């Protein structure tokens, strides 16, 4: 079976997957796996082409905060894998909580397998470099305005060759960008933005996101970042590889979401420690909200000739710690060494840019019940917020709602295209809200925004009624 994922093929991929296939055979699973890597920046375009042309493959990765599985379902691209999960998914059902697995269903049928690798209530925090705060005699910011003024001071005093810009792949979706950090400071919180276009609060109110006061506040904050020189001037054309390179080089001060490791920090500050990256929440006393029940998963394309084999492979990964370690960390003694029950030490290869020759992806098919941590190199506060369940967190009432745009197919396609051209530059702060938004909104209305929002509201109200809300 062929498993398609975003990313770059590790140097020792073939060696590791030979071992994986040998173990699959020894365990009698009856599956042989080939993993196909597509560069991240070409992912959407290439995957959509593969799906539309019916190319032969059997499993592909889903990023819910980028393109949710419902989007593929609505194109008729996903296979119903309910039967395969019931028959071959015992380990999946055992290790993925019911409320998360329920988020992978449409009309009671399974169309994806969630990756239970992260606590989704982590959405809304950001990382800050405490070593840089200390070097500049600064306190940790507690408001968006304090964040900007702190960042300005750091930028002015920065001695590195590359400035610690705000860098990301441009969008207008606060969940994808993690600009949801701002939302905790608004009186209307808790709310989330679902499927890029729809504001949903815990009372069940649905609005057009770009027409809310909250969108305007976000855009005005981003405009300040941009005009004060804190945002990368090339923000609208940045590629994911460029964003990653900045983090890997240690040339950053603030990252929305979680990032960093000791080795990357020390490229910028050789004296840095793992405690020099802190997790910050604005208004930490407020509720912690999961916008989605899961962030990543894997789905079987409708044209797959091996749907059961795909489920068997995912189930096998969670059959033992040995299987999981092989898939995620590679060959023990060559790519990593165990460090206690849940620890591991990466073996960096000087002939591979001082990185291990193999590393899997726990965002693609990881599970918190099996994950190992680099106890010397990983960031303790990030580990806690990402990989420990938050017992006080609540799910957004829209977390498991799936929108079907069939009735507004043309309008939905049009607003997606128009928003990329007209809304993203405003949300990223490159254009001024008061000056440019009226014309952009007019274009969105002409593209069919009102009709799409009305259909979303109708379906969400029906969903709420079925939930007994």
Question: What role is predicted for each listed range?
Answer:
Residues 1-469:
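Extracytoplasmic/secretory soluble proteins
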């Amino acid at each position: 079976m062929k498993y398609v994922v975003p990313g770059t093929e590790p140097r020792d991929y073939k060696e590791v997957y030979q071992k994986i296939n040998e173990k699959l055979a020894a365990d009698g699973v009856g599956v042989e796996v080939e993993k196909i890597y597509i560069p991240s920046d070409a992912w959407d375009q290439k995957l959509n082409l593969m799906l539309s042309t019916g190319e032969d493959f059997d499993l592909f990765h889903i990023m819910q905060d980028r393109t949710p599985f419902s989007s593929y379902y609505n194109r008729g691209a996903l296979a119903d894998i309910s039967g395969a999960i019931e028959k071959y998914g015992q380990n999946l059902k055992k290790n993925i909580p019911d409320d998360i697995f329920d988020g992978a269903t449409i009309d009671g049928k399974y169309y994806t397998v969630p990756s239970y690798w992260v606590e989704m209530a982590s959405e809304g925090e950001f990382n800050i470099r405490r070593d840089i705060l200390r070097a500049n005699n600064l306190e940790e910011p507690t408001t968006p305005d304090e964040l900007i003024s702190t960042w300005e001071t750091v930028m002015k005093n920065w001695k590195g060759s590359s400035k610690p810009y705000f860098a990301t792949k441009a969008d207008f979706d606060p969940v994808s960008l993690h600009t949801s950090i701002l939302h905790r400071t608004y009186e209307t919180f808790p709310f989330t933005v679902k499927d890029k276009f729809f504001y949903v609060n815990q009372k069940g109110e649905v609005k057009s996101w770009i027409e809310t006061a909250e969108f305007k506040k976000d855009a005005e904050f981003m405009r300040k970042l941009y005009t004060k020189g804190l945002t990368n001037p090339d923000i609208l054309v940045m590629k994911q590889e460029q964003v990653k390179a900045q983090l890997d080089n240690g040339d950053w001060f603030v990252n929305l979401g979680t990032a960093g490791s000791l080795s990357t920090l020390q490229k910028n500050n050789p004296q840095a420690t793992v405690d020099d990256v802190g997790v910050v929440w604005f208004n930490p006393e407020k509720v912690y909200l999961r916008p989605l029940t899961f962030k990543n998963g894997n789905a079987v394309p409708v044209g797959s000739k091996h749907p059961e084999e795909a489920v068997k492979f995912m189930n096998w990964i969670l059959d033992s710690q040995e299987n999981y370690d092989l898939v995620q960390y590679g060959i023990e003694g060559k790519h990593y060494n165990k460090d206690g029950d849940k620890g591991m030490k990466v073996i960096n290869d000087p002939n591979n840019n001082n990185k291990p020759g193999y590393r899997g992806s726990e965002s693609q098919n990881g599970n918190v019940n099996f994950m190992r941590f680099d106890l010397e190199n990983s960031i303790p506060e990030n580990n806690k917020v990402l990989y420990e369940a938050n017992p006080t967190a609540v799910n957004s009432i829209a977390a498991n709602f799936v929108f079907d745009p069939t009735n507004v197919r043309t309008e939905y396609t049009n607003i997606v295209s128009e928003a990329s051209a007209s809304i993203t530059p405003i949300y990223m702060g490159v254009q001024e809200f008061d000056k440019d938004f009226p014309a952009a909104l007019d274009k969105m209305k002409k593209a069919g925004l009102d009709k799409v929002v009305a259909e979303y509201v109708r379906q969400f109200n029906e969903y709420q009624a079925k939930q007994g809300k």
